[in-house]
Amino acid sequence: MIKDNILKIREDNEKVVVVGNRKNYYGKHVFDSRPNKKFIREFNNYTTLKQHFLGWIIKTKEKKINKKSFVFMDYRIKDKSSTAFTYVLPFKKNKALIEHTYFSKNECEKNVYEKYLMEYIEKFLKISDYEIIESESGVIPMTSYPFYKDSSKKITK
C-alpha cells in the first residue's frame, strides 16, 4: 500500500501523472475520489443520502442455504422510515453473508439492523439455528452531484 499526499493530477496525450509529496505516479487512467472545490461550494444544491448497512456472515448446522442463488435488493422487509433492502451472498450450503441496507439521511441504531437481519433469516431463509461468525458495517455517502462533468478521457471523478 502506498501512503502519500496527492498534490495534483495532470494528464497529457499518453499518460496521467499523479503528483505526490514523496514522488510522482503514472498511469493510463486514474480514479480521483477527492472532492473538488465546486462540489464543496455547491454541496447543498444536490440530493445527499447515506447508504448504510450491517451484515452478518452466518454459519448453520444444517445445509439450508442455496449456494447458487444470490439474492439482490430484496424489499420484503419494510421499514416505513426509509428505503431499505436485504441481500444474501451465499458461500456454501451452510454459510452466507446477509446484509440489511438503507438509503436515508440518517443512520440507524445497531439494534434496528439486527432486528431486520434476524427477521429476514428466520422468515425468508427459514433458518432458526445459526451462528454469527463475522459482522460488517459501513456508511457510504451518496449524492446526485454530476461528478462525470469533472471527468476526462483519462481521469474519472
Model feature map: region roles:
Residues I2-S128, T143-D150:
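Predominantly flavin-linked oxidoreductase catalytic cores and closely associated redox partners
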Residues S128-S135:
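Short secondary-structure junctions
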Residues E136-K157:
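Oxyanion-binding "anion nests"
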